[in-house]
From Swiss-Prot:
InterPro entries linked: Pentatricopeptide_rpt, TPR-like_helical_dom_sf
Pfam families tied to this protein: PPR, PPR_2
Name used for this protein in its record: Pentatricopeptide repeat-containing protein At2g19280
Keywords: Repeat
Naturally occurring in which organism (per UniProt): Arabidopsis thaliana (Mouse-ear cress)
Cited Gene3D superfamilies: Tetratricopeptide repeat domain
SUPFAM superfamilies linked to this entry: HCP-like (SSF81901)
Organism domain of life: Eukaryota
Length: 693
């Protein structure tokens, strides 16, 4: 199938060329680029235009390319030497021929490959070839064939532009969607358009590495064995990356088989390979096997390095074995290895995370370690978790005094600390400082701020941060949406809750349990209890089991309005779903009975719950006590207070307030004093009873 880039004969391309404004834009934009050798970064791979591996042929098309070409060359802002070089090579090899008022040639995939070869042979500059490759695709108006792309990839690698080859191959892998047949076609085209064996080995290694990057580990493994049929094996770095993924996805057995295959193909074991196995053993909890392999490295002729020991130390710390990690750290010198900041920082971070900063400080002094950002981040995390933000801000300032610059993690830690205390004003001060520092806020940073603003009533600030996240191109997740949704729910903006759910679905984000909890709670608070109940029913019909919290909200809503029949239907529905109501669920139902002053029903339910193994808390007892006091049954209320004390729970202000209300209903004088005396008598009596006095 033929394409003319100069003679306007094809009706298909005729239509394309009639869109003159769009066409001139692409044309001028292409030729107004700066020198390719200076600005290669401008040729970023556009995944929306990169050819699919299945595009093995051009569509039939042609285009006039005569005097317009000359006039554009005269008027566009482009380095003359680059354009002249391409033009001269095309003329030299007769790709541009005199044809009436212009020049003419015909292009198909084979012709494109030959032109690419001629350009590279004459210039030895892969960037110039890439320039023509990109321009020709825009000019033709159809995607390049898989073979043309394959040849371009070989030229890029030959011209030391591997990073551009990575862009192209990565896009091909994405377009193939992991289909073995499509990737095999790509591999076939790469093999058939090879330049020399050295380049082919590099290209196949890049292809396999791209599969690994896309987490297509099975495909990467299959391609490895397929290229082995050509006598080619991936580079050492790619083998290590693939081995790491095999260990992550498939485990030790397949990883051992792959290592044996590596050895049979001339790849040798090294510390990096064995460190991956040490990491896997430790991640699975087999620290004894990890240590055995670490100590047995010498049997393979390999000396353990600081990286291998750091892997082992780090895994010990993350598993909570800080004493053992510290011991290994101090023994490193026995193996002729000096501790570095990474190995020491791992243990310091471990101590900080378990709330032992004093042990971390001892290590810093022992190894005379100059604190780095990672160490400071660990200390800040520990201090902020205690709520001591004054001390945390002092530590934060020390970072600057040492000549270090806080990273996004440090700023986010401070922001989170202030948000937990409700100090959103201080949190925004650090957020502003983060923006001024040039560090872009992470998804976590902004999500924390939105959550705090939603909790503490600054919904407009939460919306502002949310809009800024979308402007900055951050990929929002379900937690971000849930945090803002929570704020809308608290401010009774139910319409915006539904709008956010629609936006989530449009963005391809599936609502989770927390999303539905927020939605149902918001509806119950606004009084839409029946509608909330319908949502629960619909979720169950779709196979989604709502949480206990969602059931509790609706049960509480039904109970408050006195609709105990519907409340109990949901209660028994929970049992059918093998969900056990918790104390909060029971409190919601009992609160409804107490509010309706149906205390005989309330106490029967309470006793049944006790028999079923429920462990009531102070809130549940106070609910019943308040109910009995409201109907004037002070004696029964005192009996429940005694039972509560007997179970190890002391009365609180809510208990005292319930008694006061009950005594006032009985027209007692000095009801507050009398209530205090009653509580004291009950506590003393129960104390004597339990102590045997």
């Amino acid at each position: 199938m033929w394409v003319s880039i100069f003679n306007l004969k094809s009706s298909g391309l005729n239509h394309f060329c009639t869109r003159t404004k769009a066409f001139r834009y692409f044309w001028c934009r292409t030729f107004s680029l700066a020198s390719l050798s200076e600005n290669n970064s401008r040729f970023q791979t556009d995944s929306s235009r990169l050819p699919y591996s299945g595009s093995r042929y051009y569509h039939s098309s042609s285009k006039h390319f005569g005097e317009d070409f000359v006039s554009i060359l005269k008027n566009i802002d482009v380095p003359r030497d680059c354009v002249e070089t391409i033009r001269n090579v095309l003329v030299k090899h007769n790709w541009i021929q005199k044809y009436e008022s212009g020049f003419s040639t015909e292009l198909d995939q084979y012709t494109v490959i030959r032109i690419l070869d001629d350009l590279f042979e004459e210039t030895l500059d892969a960037s110039i070839v890439l320039y023509f490759f990109r321009w020709s695709e825009l000019w033709i108006g159809v995607e390049h064939s898989s073979r043309s792309i394959s040849r371009m990839i070989h030229i890029l690698v030959s011209g030391n532009m591997n990073y551009r080859a990575v862009d192209m191959l990565l896009c091909l892998v994405k377009k193939c969607s992991g289909e073995e047949r499509s990737l095999c076609l790509v591999m076939k085209d790469l093999f058939e358009t090879r330049i020399d064996r050295r380049v082919l080995e590099t290209v196949f290694s890049i292809l396999i590495d791209c599969c690994i990057r896309e987490r297509k580990v099975n495909m990467a493994l299959k391609l490895t064995y397929k290229v082995d049929q050509f006598g080619i094996f991936p580079s050492r770095g790619v083998c290590i990356s693939l081995l790491k993924e095999i260990l992550r996805v498939h485990g030790l057995e397949l990883a051992r088989e792959f290592v044996e295959h590596m050895l049979s193909r001339g790849r040798h074991l090294n510390a990096a390979v064995l460190s991956l196995f040490i990491r896997k053993y430790c991640s699975d909890g087999y620290f004894d096997k990890g240590w055995e392999l670490l100590m047995g490295m010498k049997h393979y002729g390999i000396r353990p390095d600081i990286v291998a020991f750091t892997v082992f130390i780090d895994k010990l710390c993350k598993a909570g074995f800080l004493k053992e990690a510290t011991s290994v750290l101090f023994k490193l010198k026995l193996f002729g290895i000096s501790q570095d900041s990474v190995s020491v920082s791992s243990v310091i971070d471990g101590f900080c995370k378990v709330g032992k900063p004093e042990e971390a400080i001892k290590l810093i002094h022992s190894f005379r370690l100059r604190p780095n950002i990672f160490v400071y981040s660990s200390f800040l995390s520990n201090i902020c978790s205690t709520g001591d933000m004054l001390r945390a801000s002092t530590i934060f300032q020390e970072i600057f005094e040492l000549g270090l610059l806080p990273d996004c993690v440090c700023y986010t830690t401070m922001i989170d600390g202030y948000c937990n205390l409700g100090r959103t004003d201080k949190a925004f001060q650090y957020f502003g400082a983060l923006l001024k520092s040039g560090n872009p806020p992470s998804l976590t940073t902004s999500t924390i701020l939105i959550g705090a603003c939603s909790r503490f009533g600054s919904i407009s600030d939460a919306e502002s941060v949310f809009r800024n996240m979308k402007t900055e191109g951050l990929k929002l997740d379900v937690v971000t949406y849930n945090n803002l949704m929570h704020g809308y729910g608290k401010t009774h903006q139910l319409n915006k809750v539904f709008e956010l759910i629609d936006e989530m679905r449009s963005a391809g984000i599936s609502p989770d349990v927390a999303t539905y909890n927020i939605l149902i709670h918001s509806m119950v608070v606004r009084g839409y209890i029946d509608e909330a109940n319908e949502i629960i029913s619909e979720l169950i019909r779709r196979g989604f089991v709502p949480s206990t919290l969602a059931f509790t909200d609706v049960i509480g809503g039904f109970s408050k309005r006195g609709d105990f029949q519907e409340a109990f239907i949901l209660w028994f529905y929970m049992a059918d779903l093998r969900m056990k109501p918790d104390v909060v669920t029971c409190s919601a139902l009992l609160h409804g009975y107490c509010k309706a002053q149906r205390m005989e029903k309330a106490i029967v339910l309470f006793n049944k719950l006790l028999d079923a193994g429920l462990k009531p808390d102070v809130v549940l007892y106070n609910t019943l006590i308040h109910g009995y006091c409201s109907v004037g049954d002070i004696e029964k209320a005192c009996e429940l207070i005694g039972l509560m004390v007997q179970r190890g729970m002391l009365p609180n202000e809510s208990t005292h307030h319930a008694l006061v209300l009950g005594l006032e209903g009985k027209r007692f004088v000095n009801s507050e004093t009398h209530a205090s005396m009653l509580l004291e008598e009950i506590i003393v009596a129960k104390w004597h009873l339990t102590s045997g006095g």
